[in-house]
Amino acid sequence: MGRRPARCYRQIKNKPYPKSRYCRGVPDPKIRIFDVGAKKRLVDEFPFCVHLVSWEKENVSSEALEAGRIACNKYMVKFAGKDGFHLRVRVHPFHVLRSNKMLSCAGADRLQTGMRGAFGKPQGTCARVAIGQVLLSVRSRDNHSNHAQEALRRAKFKFPGREKIIVNRKWGFTKYTRADYLKWKTENRIVPDGVNPKLLGCRGPLSNRKPGQAFLKPAVVLSSDLVA
C-alpha cells in the first residue's frame, strides 16, 4: 500500500505532533540540507535579499521543501554560479504525519476493525506554516537580483497554496536597512561577523554616548555669590 497524498494533510487541524520518546518510528525527512551555495561569504558581499512568503496557513511536506530547494538551487547555479548566492530554507519539518492503514483487498473486512483504534502510524513529516511566514530566502549581489527572483518563481510551483515573492529592503539576511548599514559602515560602527554583522555600541562615560548626549548636560557650578 502506497503513501497517502500530501493534499490529505494540507490543512492545519490539530496540535503540533513532534518526534519524541512517545512518538517513535518516525521516518527521516526528505530535506537534509537547509543552507546551499556560498553560505560562508561575509555579509558585505551579498547585499540583495529576496523572500518566498507563504500566503496561507497550511502544512508543507518535507518532500515539497526538498523539491523547492532543488529547483531554486539549480537555476541559481546555472546563472549566478555556485559561489554567487546563498539560499536558506527558513522552515523545518518537525510535525509528524500519521496514517491509519486500511486494507482494500478481498476479505479485508475480516482483518480490520474500521475506525476502532484509528490512531495511525507515522508516515512522514511536514512544516506548519503561517500566513506571512518566509519559506525560502536568497541573498546575492545586485547584478543577480533578477535571477534570484526567477529562481524563487520556479520554486513556487513546488509548494501548495499561494506564495508571494517579496524583495527585502534590508541588507542581505540582516535586520538593518541599506541606508543604516552603509552609514554605520562608514562610521566603523558595524563589523562583519559571518552571515550577520555585529553592531558596536558606544562605550565610555554616559556624557560621551551619542544616544544620551541630548539628555545629559554638563554640571553647572554656581558661584558663591549666587549660593549666598
From Swiss-Prot:
Q: Subunit arrangement?
A: Component of the small ribosomal subunit. Mature ribosomes consist of a small (40S) and a large (60S) subunit. The 40S subunit contains about 33 different proteins and 1 molecule of RNA (18S). The 60S subunit contains about 49 different proteins and 3 molecules of RNA (25S, 5.8S and 5S).
In its UniProt record, a GO molecular function of this protein is: structural constituent of ribosome
CDD domains reported in the protein's UniProt record: Ribosomal_L16_L10e (cd01433)
Q: Name one GO cellular component term.
A: ribosome
Record the organism: Pinus taeda (Loblolly pine)
What is the name of the gene encoding this protein?
A: RPL10
Biological processes, Gene Ontology terms: translation
Q: Which family does it belong to?
A: Belongs to the universal ribosomal protein uL16 family.
Q: What is this protein called?
A: Large ribosomal subunit protein uL16
Which Pfam families did the record assign? Ribosomal_L16 (PF00252)
Which InterPro entries does the entry mention?
Answer: Ribosomal_uL16, Ribosomal_uL16_CS_euk_arc, Ribosomal_uL16_dom, Ribosomal_uL16_euk_arch, Ribosomal_uL16_sf
| Alphabetic keyword roster | Ribonucleoprotein, Ribosomal protein
Q: Which residues form a coiled coil?
A: none
